[in-house]
């Protein structure tokens, strides 16, 4: 198992017969048995591997009421030993219930909260899970319908890096959260109940890094192959950081490039007008453009490795055309069969 579980608990928020949301609080933590360990380890791996997460911090309470400090205050009491985990999670459940009550669409769900350690960091994982119906076959071969937690489709989840939060009060990225489909951020109510404010535009930072790398190789005396090797090295480093759940560190990345004979990237990135943070989370989908070109439009989808540009793939911006030399075998087969049938 990749995590060490300290506490875990589940509370239920559901509608009563009058349509009002109510909390059903569990009076003690979940027993750290095999089922809990397997579930939380799976959730940790799934969450860590999710691309496109947002990052934020506990906001300062303002007149607009968007940064409610109640969750952060309760968490501070829990970490300071003035509040037990069960009491803290119960307060959090009631805060979420109050926030959900502001919306007509809410059906509630199961609030899972867990404190655990992974490598050298302490985390608080918070997720609102839903139940999903499924069928099973009984011993007598009859079918039976039951409900189970839908762990494969988590849309409302956040994770607080407690170690970073307590060590660096100026950090604006110790809370990560899942963004919804089509690039939308997680439902506002889930961030609001925690008093979380988005602090780091991860995609923008990764896009800026990519631009800095492109400018760096363009201004260098590297050959075409060496330039692509540089791009690949940057992507490899950033992918490793993403898989480890660690931030990209510009100085560390520059040292990696220096080991490959590509000096001065740090001075180049910091000396320009790139406005890059020293550290920020990786976004694979953005940085993948260092290795691949891809696009979709007008019923055409095209994707190819960057190293093929100018060789197997010729782009002419004047005529707005792309010439592909050496059509992929499976595509060639489809095209040949279609032409024979016409």
Curated annotation (Swiss-Prot):
NCBIfam families: PRK00378.1 (NF001557). Transmembrane segments: none annotated. InterPro entries: Nucleoid_associated_NdpA. It comes from the Bacteria. The keyword Cytoplasm applies. PANTHER family: NUCLEOID-ASSOCIATED PROTEIN YEJK, PTHR38772. Belongs to the YejK family. This is Nucleoid-associated protein Sbal_2534. GO terms for molecular function: double-stranded DNA binding; single-stranded RNA binding. Keywords: Cytoplasm.
């Amino acid at each position: 198992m990749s995590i060490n579980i300290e506490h875990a608990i589940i509370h239920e928020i559901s509608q009563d017969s009058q349509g009002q949301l109510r909390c059903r609080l569990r009076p003690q933590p979940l027993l750290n048995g095999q089922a809990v360990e397997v579930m939380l380890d799976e959730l940790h791996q799934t969450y860590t591997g999710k691309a496109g997460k947002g990052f934020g911090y506990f906001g300062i309470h303002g007149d607009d009421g968007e940064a409610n400090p109640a969750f952060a205050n309760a968490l501070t009491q829990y970490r300071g030993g003035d509040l037990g985990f069960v009491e803290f999670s119960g307060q959090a459940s009631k805060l979420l219930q109050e926030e959900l009550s502001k919306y007509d669409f809410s059906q509630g769900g199961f609030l899972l909260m867990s404190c655990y350690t992974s490598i050298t960091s302490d985390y608080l994982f918070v997720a609102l899970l839903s139940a999903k119906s499924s069928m099973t076959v009984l011993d007598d071969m009859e079918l039976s319908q039951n409900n189970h937690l839908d762990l494969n489709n988590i849309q409302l989840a956040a994770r607080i890096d407690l170690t970073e939060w307590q060590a660096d009060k100026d950090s604006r990225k110790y809370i990560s959260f899942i963004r919804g489909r089509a690039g939308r951020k997680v439902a506002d109510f889930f961030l609001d109940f925690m008093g979380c404010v988005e602090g780091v535009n991860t995609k923008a930072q990764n896009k800026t890094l990519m631009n800095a790398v492109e400018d760096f190789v363009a201004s260098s005396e590297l050959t075409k192959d060496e330039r692509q090797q540089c791009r690949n090295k940057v992507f490899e480093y950033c992918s490793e950081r993403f898989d480890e759940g660690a931030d990209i560190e510009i100085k560390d990345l520059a040292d990696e490039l220096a080991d490959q004979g590509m000096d001065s990237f740090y001075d180049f990135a910091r000396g320009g007008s790139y406005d890059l943070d020293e550290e920020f989370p990786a976004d694979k989908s953005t940085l993948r453009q260092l290795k691949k070109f891809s696009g979709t439009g007008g019923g055409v989808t095209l994707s190819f490795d960057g190293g093929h540009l100018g060789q197997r793939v010729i782009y002419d911006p004047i005529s707005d055309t792309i010439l592909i030399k050496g059509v992929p075998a499976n595509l060639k087969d489809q095209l040949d069969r279609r032409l024979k049938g016409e």
